[in-house]
């Protein structure tokens, strides 16, 4: 069987890069965040430009965290400045770094999601110049997987050369650069991009490409921490693993081959994670049997319909009830239109990440039934805290 070569390509701070390019600014040297400052400062930044991230700001910071971090940076700059005075400010990072008398500044760009989708479509057309659609799997608006196995002979290029050619074409076409990971399966390509590309020096165009195979993955990343850096390992998984003495992918791999009498063995992983332990074990060893063809052919057993609203301020029970009513109406109409019924209702409320699930005795599409259930959830979760 022919070995596969996959690449995972991620557009660098995509939303922020689009906003920079449209202002005729360099995405790599412009301090910019994408956020709706018309809301409160608790609003989440959808993107932070690479140069601004270098000041210790995360890619998913809330706007008030950006304000605080920039204020701390400027307090230190003022202390170090001649005469302890800042004479101006700039969002152009090279200028800030060259002139100690300037305060760090940044641009706040309001998000334009429909516009970003148009840009993503334009970039997808660049991928199609090199790879057929059946060998491309869009993972998100700014990230794709590609199987380039059958194209290397066609273009007479190595995997790295073809990957770099595609990225440079994106840069030439849009002004946006990208990072990429390469590997013999989807998982290793993704991890090479997520972790490996961060530690690879950028070339003159800002391009970073990292590559992993099973053996280099084990050599380089079996001791890597934290576990949450790895694809599909969230905080819940990491906390559960650490509670049982597993802190790295190497620990998980060793656990999977433990003897039956040992505390750390495969049975422990299945006890902790059920059938999902199989995926975790495979990934610990650098294995991933799923292909792009498998991903494209996947059809979920269950369907879900979602209605959501972002509240601009805290709501009391009566206001929340009105919102629930509107959402119940919308969901009921959607169910009727699709000729469906449901036996489960999920309501997610607020910053507390409280999720309530009610299983229904009889399937329904009635907005009245769903409203009653939502009121029950709201009464349980919110009524005792009306303010």
Q: Model-derived features: where do they sit?
A:
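DNA-contacting surface of Y-family translesion DNA polymerases
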Residues: 8, 229, 237-387
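Gly/Gly-Pro- and Ser/Thr-rich, intrinsically disordered tail segments characteristic of DNA damage-repair
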Residues: 1-285, 289-292
